[in-house]
Amino acid sequence: KMYDFGL
């Protein structure tokens, strides 16, 4: 993914 921050 693009936004794979793990939030």
Swiss-Prot record:
**What cystine pairs are annotated?**
none
Asked if the keyword Secreted belongs to this entry, the reply reads yes
* Major localisation: secreted
Q: Could you tell me which residues carry Leucine amide?
A: L7
Q: Which UniProt keywords apply?
A: Amidation, Neuropeptide, Secreted
GO CC aspect terms: extracellular region
- Domain of life according to the entry: Eukaryota
BP GO terms, sorted: neuropeptide signaling pathway
Query: Where does the record say this protein resides?
Result: Secreted
Family designation: Belongs to the allatostatin family.
This protein is called Cydiastatin-7
Question: Which organism does this sequence originate in?
Answer: Cydia pomonella (Codling moth)
